């Protein structure tokens, strides 16, 4: 966006007072230019002030996920070195020696690779190499050594799988009998142990694997998903019996959009696939729970472990189980399976979840299962099912919805799909239509689901084919459900799946408050049994098998946080059976064990909590991203909705951009498992009526409380350390800390600090310093108070204002919009409620400047501080500074105007370019858009607004035909601010055309006629006179001259092309003819605008250019003095407020405002802090 004032060079006030001076070193050999790079500290802390102390810096590092893991590296390196050095395996001893030599060689090669004159090499070795690795050659080598040792140790640690069965504590080597091992009372006998004939180090690796497994289960809630899948397929005669092959062409393949399951008669006798398998599955064929019927036969009772097993022979996908955990479930599962799995987890945990429909009777045909007669399904709502309905009351027919018929042919098939296809096909030829609005008078024949809950009943219905009527809603029905199974039916990209959580309720229990929670010990036992079963192929019979690669899974988990996981494992490992290597490792680690016990669990929990919050965002993105192509097909200029076929929304409601109920699963783990690692759960904040709160606002409060607990824990830990400044090496630019006079801890702390103060990103310490510079300034506190007042007001519709804050509040959404417009995903905060898109702007802004959270946008916060400081500076003393800027930059006679893009005013702005989806609501947003996509409006540059609405009639050549402005409750979008020759939001051609149009129709830029006469009389500039004459020449005189003089004489030349008139004569001529143009000024008998303080309601005109239309109001230098935020004079106060907001966001204006205050003198002890400040420009 262009502002009126522009500066080519951005003034960085906060660096004033900072200096980088040369360190004078006696007999120094580096060149002066090299020494210029050495930072001269002015503080022994990171920066002067409590937040810049050494302890505060370390606290910040140890509570930051990207930095905290480095603090355990020193103790781990001690332990690993001892293990490698004392190991009984000589190859391991040799690896340590070779690695140390490699590190030495690596250091030499790195140093020799520095391109620098020899005399400067010491400077750049220190700054470019050692400062990044703890400050010394020894710390650099230690860091490199650790990286290579931990990589090798990880490979050795997971080279073997040490999961075993130990009945009565005795290692069993088999044979393993399913009927014995499948009994839950046996599961406690599984564990990790070296084999009888073990190799050196096997005992240690087995113990560490056990601890890593324990951490994995506790911190991530591993879940084994059981599933049977039935894939779509085409019948022998092709999909053309139902779908429109002429319209769909090569897009028509068996898929989620065009589902089909061949009938039994179309499946070869020797193939047991599709409908054949489905019929056998719902009958419970080969199920292990022989006391039950139907699908329940695949679910063992609670006392049998609640195991869920599907025979591989009854699934088109032979992999009938999948292991996931809370940190990879979003990435591992397809969107439909993901939603269903999380919904089922929440059901088992007795937490709030989205309601799914229940299928009372499972049909033996898959086609008649995904398309269900409404009488055979209950708990269906507009958010969880789709259907086709009779609608004789709604005469407005949406073509995009009716076009869905083009996906089908008119079928007379007696099946559900045939009837559904026929019904859709009749949409545009009768009173049948696809509707997105529920009505109590409507009825539905068929319902289509993407996820549903099965009851354990079967139906012997005839063989049929299926479909889905896209995105209509259903009438609620009320039935008593019985015998609901803890399973989910899912319609996904592959086919239809039956999903269950294996052992799901077995390892759940009720706590003292009767709340459901995990029994982590039972969960460990269950998972070990299943992993051992897969490892040893201990299945009931050949019909059952699955894969559970535990070792590979543990390694993947380990590598995500290997430093913190390993140190936590060492803390909990019992070294009873010790070889020399393990004994040495234990002794080396024991020196730090007590200290690590206080820190490592908190650090690991902090990182996992952060990752779980990130999983919430990932879930929202995954479920929303599936709709991109669907919406494109509907929203493009030439829509092709039939290509979406039977695609629909998932039955999980999105609120404010978040799938709140599904995200409740991650919140459950955060609050019920991990919060206790860093503090204690505050039930009054996290729960309501014994259920977790799910709104975004409540989740943020929970997050903030947890972050406060983390800060307290880390602060308590650091306060137990002796933190002092370590002597600085020559030429170093950084502060080094010493911890407890211990080299390992000292290295660890400095590695953590270096990760925190990464010079490529804005660091929290630089932010804290800069924030303090603002908050300690009285003017800023005044500015902050003003903005809080603006934010708290609702911006009433009246254009009259009693305070500056009132006017600014009416247009503050323009400032919020500047944040929203930069978003790649503009629907990340959901769809607007009742078209109130301003609420989304505000959400985007508030989140961008939120100073809580794990990923604070420091740059956005500081930019906001500059803005509000500048805003206060502009408005004080009745807009004095704002007016001074305008006076300095708008010359007398220069044309300027305020304009609105009328194309935006007149267009539907509810869904620009389809950013809020489509009328089909594939996102299942609580505020479904009812507007078709407007492809002519760019959401990145039109949403500036005012309360004032410039209603006009088409203009004649004179400006006197303009109508007064009016006001609107919601305001008017399309506001383009103040436009001049050098600055405009409009395209250059449009801006120039409008300037030319004004020049050809107005002399208002000169104020009154008397003002211009005075100016002409006083000027000494020939070019100024020529410019005025040219402007007058473009106008038609409104009266004839009584003295016979005309403007044409001004341009007369003699025989040699010199002007016929001299300067004085030209002045006199212009003064003489000016009365002929009186109608182009304000009334010559009235005082100039600058003196008419009571003049109100200036009027807008209409201008058309290139097929587009604009409403504009000419603005002149004489308008400036009467501008006000509290009274509407020549320009409405809310328009003035919008102009002030634009000016406050201009970086050049911010420079000017900040230069008016006393510049802070920063005392900094570490160049990395200065680097962080530079990134905050």
Curated annotation (Swiss-Prot):
Q: Which UniProt keywords apply?
A: Cell membrane, Lipoprotein, Membrane, Palmitate, Signal
Q: Name one Pfam family in it.
A: DUF3713
Q: Which residues form the signal peptide?
A: 1-26
Tagged with keyword Cytoplasm: no
Gene Ontology cellular-component annotations: plasma membrane
Q: Matching PROSITE patterns, A to Z?
A: PROKAR_LIPOPROTEIN (PS51257)
Q: What is this protein called?
A: Uncharacterized lipoprotein MG307
Question: Lipid (S-diacylglycerol cysteine) linked to which residue positions?
Answer: 27
Family under the similarity heading: Belongs to the MG307/MG309/MG338 family.
The cellular location(s) given in this protein's UniProt record come to: Cell membrane
The record, for InterPro entries, names:
DUF3713
Q: How does it sit in the membrane?
A: Lipid-anchor
Species lineage: Bacteria, Bacillati, Mycoplasmatota, Mycoplasmoidales, Mycoplasmoidaceae
Where is this chain lipid-modified, annotation N-palmitoyl cysteine? 27
